[in-house]
Amino acid sequence: VGGRILEKQSLGVDGVTGATISSMALKYAVGECLKQAKVSAEDLKDLKKNVEEYKALPNTMKTQVVIIGGGGSGLAAAVAASQAGADVIVLEKLGLLGGSTNVSEGALNAADPIRQPKLGIEDSVAKHIDQTLKGGHNVGNPELVKHLCEGAYPAVEWLESIGVKFKDEVGTATGALWQRSHYPATPSGNSYIRVFEKYIAEHPNVQVITDIEAKDVLKDADGRVTGVLAKHNKTGRYTLFKAEKGVIIATGGFGANVKLRQEVNTGVFKAYDLGKSIGCTNFQKSAQGSGILMGKEVGANVIGMADIQVHPCGTPGTGLMEMIRTSGRNRVFINTDGNRFV
């Protein structure tokens, strides 16, 4: 990336696949150095304009499965669809893959018959289900909670089968009620993304297109979803992606969409202002709820929109996660006067 910046004399260069966070950090750091060197805001804006050449996409592309969103869930869906024999196209509006998973801790809760007994931890799927329901004040859908908890350890095994390595110890993530949180051996959720990217690079039946934003989900006369209309951010051209077997919307949440979160804030935090002073722990450029809104436009039902999670470890103002290397069981929260308030 550094070589490209020097060659093009621009920050508007592509990152390196498999090193998305490092590429983004390097370009940000160079930009900060330019600011310190008194480069004007206007010149800096010009330096950030993209200088890469992009071949225009066809007006229409056909595949079996179209996935909107190249974050953790979208890439996991792409790998699973590929393993099932489908041809897949993933559409990602940013110039890098990973979305909010890239900036997560990567915790995955699962009752583990291998790791937990070695640590003297008693657990079961039934206990996981019970604690998940109680942790949600018993407003969760029991069938979905059961599906989540029963599928949690198989998800760990599946991730391991494609190359993810987990630590031998399990912890207690923030908000968890039991010591069953699995963490990648290499810290952060970016570990998952690197494995997904490696798998996709080795399987030509999965095509990833970045810098392209889905604008509309399309239906036929019978109401069946048949494709996606998307606009390439760099060329400004539209492409119709026809999906023979279906479209998966995996665009994540809406934590960075201040207007939307204020509109739906009718739940436990309705007495509080979730305006701009509250940051977003997710990757802000992607956490806009675009997939939810597109789904609603074609008749999809939505549930739980008011069930907004407020995280205690976000940096005030920005919401970026603070790297607090302690268990959720042993933190003490104090205010600026040193008084405990939790």
Where are these regions (language model features)?
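Active-site- and interface-proximal helix/loop "cap" or "latch" segments in soluble metabolic
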Residues: 1-49
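A short, basic/flexible loop-to-alpha-helix module at the beginning of a structural domain
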Residues: 45-62, 338
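Beta1/beta-strand and adjacent pyrophosphate-binding region of the FAD-binding site
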Residues: 54-73, 89
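Glycine-rich FAD pyrophosphate-binding loop
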Residues: 83-103
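Conserved N-terminal/central alpha/beta ligand/cofactor-binding core
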Residues: 96, 102-207, 211-216, 261-263, ...
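Helical element adjacent to the flavin cofactor pocket in flavoenzyme catalytic cores
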Residues: 187-245, 292, 298
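Glycine-rich loop(s) and the adjacent beta-strand/alpha-helix scaffold that form part
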Residues: 234-237, 242-314
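FAD cofactor-binding and catalytic pocket of flavoenzymes
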Residues: 308-342
